[in-house]
Amino acid sequence: MEEGMEMQPAATRIQRETNPESRQSDDFWLRLDNAAKIYPAVQSEELTSVFRLSAVMKERIRIGPFLKAVNLLEQRFPYYKMKLHKGFFWYYLQYVDENMTVKPDGGAVCRSFEKQELLFRILVQGNKVSVEFSHILADGAGAFEFLKSLLMTYLETCDLIIPSKTAFHRPEEKPAEEEYEDAFSKYVQANLPSPLKIPKSFHLPFDLRTIPRYRALSFLIPVGEIMTTAKTYGVTLTVYLVAVYLYALQRISNKPTLSRKHMRRRIFRIQVPVNLRRMYPSKTMRNFTLFVTPEIDLRLGQYTFEEIIKTVYHHMQLETDRKLINKIISRNVSAERNILLKSTPLFIKSLILHFTYKIAGTSRYSGVITNLGKASFGSGADKHIDYLQFIPPPPNKTLKVNCGVIGFDSKLVLSFGNITTSRELEREFISVLTDDGVHVKHLDG
């Protein structure tokens, strides 16, 4: 921050400087995209559907230029300046002509949004900038593009980088319609067979913490080290991390203290989000992610780490085939377009979605790991950033732990979100990494 300037305890509001004629019309509204429709039916004060992306800079944030950067971006992302509303049949997003606010960071991470709030927030503390988004608005890839635009605009405002043609959503650009399209509906193929149903899976046996339950724990890992380790197995970083996760779960399941109840399910399955923008030519800033679900089946016996690596690799290769992804998109969008479901009142529809999420959703997998990949800002901006951090949304009471990964320059940050009294999964996960020669450092805060 600038010398002598402090963040106020309340939200910091700034005077709009943009031309009133450039403002988005108040009648601008959006249907929830296909992936977002489940969240209003299942979210709560604890299960918030909110995730966090942070950039830790090498110098303290200068609040004056930062607020100016926020002001410059006021009209650039109208599809994020939304509030959730109930219709008779569906929830929808309604544009609100309110200024974005900057708040001091320091409270609980990934907390829920109040009814009067926008569905994203900007937070600052020292040299750290964070944005938190509801999954109703966007996935991690969309939120990262917002954070990138915010940081690039801030650095240009500070004269720390020279304005260039680096690809980011610039303040002076008019938002393109494809930025807020429902890409699932755009790329769906009709009348495809549905994917096969999968059986229920193993879940962690740990007790829940008292409310507020959610806490995050992050670790710093040298990118070069972990990439080299993954390459020794002949796989990508994502495949390697999923294998580590499954191996850690297998170790936990072998503990003599585990009850028979928790060992009834011997299938260990991890949900891995896939950014569909890499498969389809979409520029949407909303949700466009599906999951693949590599697994091991302990009914067949114990797995060596090398066997898990091989199993995960082939699962990922098969399930990320575009034809199989098309089947999942077709199933999801077809359900949304079902005439009976479309004509069902919202309160009944929400009960159906909540039941489906609980019975056919979370019971089918043992964990989630989201890898946002290795990020870069370019244009001289990278040298001003130390590392990035991605904290996943709070898990439900069945799943209990989530994991998020993001890389930047020479540093990878691995974050666990946990609602239990135990840190055993984190310990086993890190133990597998260190056994493989990867150095891991705990990040304070």
Language-model features, listed with the residues they occupy:
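Short coil/turn segments at secondary-structure boundaries
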Residues: 196-202, 323-329, 445
